[in-house]
Structure formats: structure tokens, C-alpha cells
């Protein structure tokens, strides 16, 4: 067994993401029995000593039948109505399944916006930490009744990666109808063009030839979403296992199935992870070539002298993108000036500025490369 599978197998704190297709029948009906089977596997991991946080999709699917709908809705308002009804059924199903093992569950509804705002981010972290301290099983889901982009893209894949870092998890396990990563669609493979299974992703070269497909009609997250989320978590220092829900027992027991994603050697700090992946950008600073070198290669602070233009409306303490002259983002950071104030001093050397304004536009400690 590789060291990365071993890391998943022995992880003491685990986030398990359950996709919509793992909780529904082939016809799209929410299936409480499937959920109960997953809880049995999760309970086995918890009895072995691991702390588990669950990120559960399926609210919209769970609301289809109670509302008398024949299929998953396509318009936003009906999706949100289905989510409103389905969320009740979903959390009740989780609660009933864990009650068999005398465990209490707590529901945490989030949107990407909640994670992006530092105050809400910290509040969510405290809530999850307290639930775990009280030995309750946290069931996290996106708040689909108010979310917009989140309800259409990701199927909780990205949220699970953010939650994994939020709670300081040692591993992230993604369970759905996808049994791992392939360099082609296995459903369309032929003897002449087989789809090669990729057991481990440890370097960019391991992804050569990988084609990211679309999700099923029941969920919204396809291979592209799962791959992006797995790489996000791995880049932050969290090992990831992508496996089929049908193999949940083995995935949670010994990590012997699916594709494992190797984490970066050093775990990213919570603050830098938030800046890079969670925070919403309030604007952008365009840097000259010298400033890009100073920030990226020399890891120095960004001074007003190296900024050529400022866009957006931001205040000191907001997160902004740092862009090269060709427009691509090279870093993100917490800006020390309001937009109007910074715009008035860009391109000027520090000694030209009043004493009270001789500070970096973005300090090196508040920068993260992208």
C-alpha cells in the first residue's frame, strides 16, 4: 500500500463527501436504505477511532417525490423549493440512521459565500469544532434554498474540500457513482481504446490524457468537479480518496479502492488557504514585471511602486488578486489600503510618500501564490 493510501487509512479526522447518486435509485428516487448502508460503513470507521464529518448532497433529489415532481427540476426556483422540502427528509434520514448507533447528528448549512467571508468562515469553524467536541456527527450541506451558482455547479465537491481544511481533517474521501480516475470515459471504452484506470495522482504527469466529463442527471458534479476539488484539497495538504459509494466499506476501512491524490508536503496555513481558495476577491492590482519577480520568486512584500493599475472597489483588509501585465493572476493577498487611497500612490517610490503611507500595499505575510 502506498504511503498516501496509508495516510487515508490511518487518518484520525476524516471528511466524507456523499454524492447525490450515492443516495438515490437509478430512477432518481431518494433511497433511505442506501443512506443507511453508508452510515454502517461510516460507523465502522468511527468505531475504529476516527472523527468523521459528512458533507451530504441529495437535498434536491430528496424533495422530488414529496412535491410530486416526475424528475429533477431545471429552473432555479423549483430547485430551491425541492431543496427546502428535501433537506428536511435528508437530515431526518441521517438522524434516523445514526440513531441506530446511539449517535446524534447536527445539521450545518453553508454556501460558498459563507466560507468566503472571514467572520462567517470562523463561525462555521467554531460550530463544527463544537459539534465534534460534543460527539455529534456534523452533516454539512450547501444551503440550496438560497444558493445560486452553488446549486448548479459542484454537487458539494468544492465545499467538501473547503470543509476538510476548515476542520483540519487528515483526509477527504469523495464517494459517488465514480469509482476512480480514468484517462477516458470507461463507459465509452472499447478494446481498441480502453480507459486506463489511474490508481494514484502524485504529480501533474499522472493526469496526462485525463478527460473530465459531466455529471449525471441526478447530481451536478461530474469528474471535472471532483478532480478540481481533489486537487484543491491535496494542494492544501490533505490526502484525498476518490471512490464509488458501492465500495464505501473498503474505502473507509483500508482505502484499498479508488484513486488516491497525494497531498503537498507541507500543509497550507488556514489563513493562506482561505485567501487562495475561499475568499471572494474585491478587486485586482496589476503588477509590473519587477514586482511580479519580487512577489513570486523573492517572496517579498508588494510595494505601491510596483503597481501599474488598480481595479475594483475594496477597503483595507479585503482580499485582492495580483495580476501580471498579461492579465493572469499570480497571487492573492490582503490589501492594506482602500482602493481610492492606493490608486493615488501607485508607481511612486516609498521615499516619495508621506511617512504614514510608507507601508506595503500587500505584506509578504498576507500573500499566497496561485
UniProtKB/Swiss-Prot annotation:
It comes from the Bacteria. The keyword Cytoplasm applies. This is Glutamate 5-kinase. InterPro entries: AceGlu_kinase-like_sf, Asp/Glu/Uridylate_kinase, G5K_ProB, Glu/AcGlu_kinase, Glu_5kinase, Glu_5kinase/COase_Synthase, Glutamate_5-kinase_CS, PUA. The keyword Transferase applies. Residues 282-360 form the PUA domain. Belongs to the glutamate 5-kinase family. Signal peptide: none annotated. Pathway: Amino-acid biosynthesis; L-proline biosynthesis; L-glutamate 5-semialdehyde from L-glutamate: step 1/2. It is an enzyme of class 2 (transferase). GO terms for biological process: L-proline biosynthetic process. Catalyzes the transfer of a phosphate group to glutamate to form L-glutamate 5-phosphate. Its EC number is 2.7.2.11. It holds the Pfam family AA_kinase. Keywords: Amino-acid biosynthesis, ATP-binding, Cytoplasm, Kinase, Nucleotide-binding, Proline biosynthesis, Transferase.
Amino acid at each position: 500500500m502506498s504511503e498516501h493510501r496509508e495516510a487515508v487509512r490511518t487518518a484520525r479526522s476524516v471528511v466524507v463527501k456523499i454524492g447525490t447518486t450515492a443516495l438515490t435509485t437509478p430512477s432518481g428516487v431518494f433511497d433511505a436504505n442506501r443512506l443507511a448502508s453508508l452510515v454502517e460503513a461510516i460507523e465502522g470507521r468511527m468505531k475504529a477511532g476516527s472523527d468523521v464529518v459528512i458533507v451530504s448532497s441529495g437535498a434536491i433529489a430528496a424533495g422530488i417525490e414529496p412535491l410530486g415532481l416526475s424528475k429533477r427540476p431545471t429552473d432555479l426556483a423549483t430547485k430551491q423549493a425541492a431543496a427546502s422540502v428535501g433537506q428536511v427528509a435528508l437530515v431526518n434520514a441521517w438522524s434516523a440512521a445514526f440513531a441506530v448507533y446511539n449517535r446524534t447528528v447536527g445539521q450545518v448549512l453553508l454556501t460558498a459565500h459563507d466560507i468566503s467571508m472571514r467572520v462567517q468562515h470562523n463561525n462555521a469553524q467554531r460550530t463544527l469544532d463544537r459539534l465534534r467536541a460534543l460527539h455529534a456527527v456534523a452533516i454539512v450541506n450547501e444551503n440550496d434554498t438560497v444558493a445560486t451558482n452553488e446549486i448548479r455547479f459542484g454537487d458539494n465537491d468544492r465545499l467538501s474540500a473547503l470543509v476538510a481544511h476548515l476542520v483540519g481533517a487528515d483526509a477527504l474521501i469523495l464517494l459517488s457513482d465514480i469509482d476512480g480516475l480514468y484517462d477516458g470515459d470507461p463507459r465509452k471504452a472499447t478494446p481498441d481504446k480502453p480507459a486506463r484506470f489511474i490508481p494514484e495522482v502524485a504529480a501533474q504527469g499522472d493526469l496526462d490524457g485525463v478527460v473530465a466529463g459531466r455529471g449525471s442527471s441526478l447530481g451536478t458534479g461530474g469528474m471535472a468537479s471532483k478532480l478540481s476539488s481533489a486537487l484543491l484539497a491535496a494542494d492544501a495538504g490533505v490526502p484525498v480518496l476518490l471512490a464509488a459509494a458501492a465500495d464505501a466499506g473498503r474505502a473507509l476501512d483500508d482505502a484499498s479502492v479508488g484513486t488516491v491524490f497525494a497531498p503537498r508536503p507541507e500543509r497550507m496555513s488556514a489563513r493562506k488557504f482561505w485567501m487562495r481558495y475561499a475568499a471572494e476577491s474585491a478587486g485586482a492590482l496589476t503588477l509590473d514585471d519587477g514586482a511580479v519577480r519580487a512577489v513570486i520568486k523573492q517572496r517579498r512584500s508588494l510595494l505601491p511602486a510596483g503597481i501599474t493599475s488598480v481595479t475594483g472597489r475594496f477597503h483595507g483588509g479585503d482580499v485582492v488578486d495580483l495580476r501580471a501585465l498579461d492579465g493572469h493572476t499570480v497571487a492573492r493577498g490582503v490589501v492594506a489600503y482602500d482602493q481610492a487611497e492606493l490608486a493615488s500612490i501607485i508607481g511612486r517610490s516609498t521615499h516619495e510618500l508621506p511617512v504614514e503611507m510608507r507601508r506595503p500595499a500587500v505584506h509578504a505575510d498576507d500573500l499566497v501564490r496561485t
